[in-house]
């Protein structure tokens, strides 16, 4: 789950090229709104919010500086763009605000329910207490202990060498491909 501010950052991360025709950007705007509406219907609020923010940024911040919008020549696409600004943008701004409230509430709820670590890391320097030391019994013979470890290591190597020799598989008979012939006949058409 992402916060609305994180989603907004993602939404604003796209390339805009003012040399692309306005007609193509208007078609893109329609596609973005349709995809956002589909995401909202599927209860994917994060994706819907991201797409609506991208749409608003495209309409309000990027297309305003497009060369076809800034010309004095009236065109169908320029009128369509102003129609978007007048009719669609206010409605989408309202939808976006509602989604932002829902996303932030869900994000806050999840953030409050996330388990936090209570483990406190001990300092890097280890201090030993005399009570923490382990005292070996007086009957402990370190030389015998080392011999036992050595014998165990040697016997395990010997055992693994024996088990490897048991893994040999018998040779498989070879098939002679030249002695077998297969003929194919094509059916008459």
Curated annotation (Swiss-Prot):
Cited InterPro entries: USP8_dimer (IPR015063)
Function: Inhibitor of the DOA4 deubiquitinase involved in the regulation of protein degradation by the proteasome and maintenance of a normal level of free ubiquitin.
Organism the protein comes from: Kluyveromyces lactis (strain ATCC 8585 / CBS 2359 / DSM 70799 / NBRC 1267 / NRRL Y-1140 / WM37) (Yeast)
The entry's keywords: Endosome, Protease inhibitor, Thiol protease inhibitor
Similarity-based family: Belongs to the RFU1 family.
Major localization class: other
Record keyword Coiled coil present: no
GO CC annotation: endosome
Origin: domain of life: Eukaryota
Subcellular location: Endosome
Protein name: Regulator of free ubiquitin chains 1
One Gene Ontology term of the molecular function aspect: cysteine-type endopeptidase inhibitor activity
Cross-referenced PANTHER family: AMSH-LIKE PROTEASE, PTHR12947:SF20
